[in-house]
Regions:
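A short SAM/SAH-binding and catalytic strip from SAM-dependent methyltransferases
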Residues: 112-124
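Conserved class I S-adenosyl-L-methionine
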Residues: 1-42, 56-60, 77-80, 143-165, 204-207
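A short acidic, Gly/Pro-enriched loop at the edge of an enzyme's catalytic core
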Residues: 101-112
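Class I SAM-dependent methyltransferase SAM/SAH-binding core
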Residues: 48-50, 54-102
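Short alpha-helix
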Residues: 172-186
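A short glycine-rich, Lys/Arg-flanked "PGG" loop and its adjoining helix->strand segment in the class I
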Residues: 126-138
Length: 253
């Protein structure tokens, strides 16, 4: 019998906590800059960073809000967030461990729920969004950032394949339309969005997750077999580096 999805996520990310804290891809980006703009002016807000990983959302918004709860399945990730928060003097960041599908917070506990590069690991995507709605105050805002599927079936199949080969805890990168539909179903009103193109250097992308050599070779073999449509959209280079689509989507409770 294999591990549960939660156990798989924990085993994938726990040992990689230092790599994700240090990751330039996760530590910076136009989406983080825009996020800071959106939360500025909410000096007393209580914020939930859902699936916080290495804590970069928490670190960016903490100086601009009242309190941030960094929430993640991985104890090791949370320990890293606590350490870096202390190093940076971010006294208004606390941590909490748990699953996104069952948040240990009362209704209306937060003014803002933020999440970045986490939702594609959620086993219960819709359940998690329902929980986001529950813990937000009336008219509270969710700001959700993730890799998105470009939509067309061929491009989608390629993206999901390389993601799962790299990281077996991957579930799905959703399209923007799928996100909007799921938010509506959860009782959240989708709002403004931004889209971005994110360049990934192949060797560091693989190293960050400590991907098995056989799986890394399979990704390179798949890339070499792809049609021009895939090569062009993902801008796949000879060394395997490529570009993906990401988004920032706002929603209101």
């Amino acid at each position: 019998m294999g591990p549960s999805h939660s156990q798989l996520v924990g085993s994938q990310f726990g040992p990689r906590s230092a790599a994700y804290v240090a990751s330039a891809v996760h530590a910076q980006g136009a989406d983080l800059d825009h996020l800071v703009e959106l939360v500025s002016g909410h000096a007393t807000a209580r914020v939930l960073d859902l699936g916080c990983g290495g804590g970069h959302v928490s670190f960016h918004v903490a100086p601009h809000v009242g309190h941030v709860t960094a929430y993640d399945l991985s104890h090791e990730m949370l320990a890293a967030v606590e350490r870096v928060s202390a190093e940076r003097g971010l006294a208004n960041v606390s941590t909490q461990q748990g699953r996104v599908e069952s948040l240990p917070f009362p209704e209306g506990a937060f003014d803002l729920v933020l999440s970045r590069y986490s939702a594609h690991h959620w086993h219960g995507f819709q359940s998690a969004l329902i929980e986001v709605k529950r813990v937000l105050k009336p008219q509270g805002k969710a700001i959700l950032m993730d890799v998105v599927s470009p939509g067309p079936a061929l491009l989608d199949t390629y993206l999901q394949a390389v993601e799962m080969l790299r990281d077996p805890s991957h579930v799905r990168n959703y399209t923007l339309d799928e996100w909007r539909s799921a938010l509506c179903e959860a009782g959240l009103a989708p709002g403004a969005h931004e889209v971005y193109r994110l360049r990934l250097e192949f060797n560091s992308w693989i190293a960050r997750m400590n991907t098995a050599r056989l799986h890394a070779q399979a990704i390179r073999s798949l890339q070499a077999s792809m049609s021009e449509d895939v090569l062009r959209h993902f801008e796949i280079d000879a060394d395997g580096s490529f570009t993906i689509d990401t988004m920032l989507l706002e929603a209101t409770a």
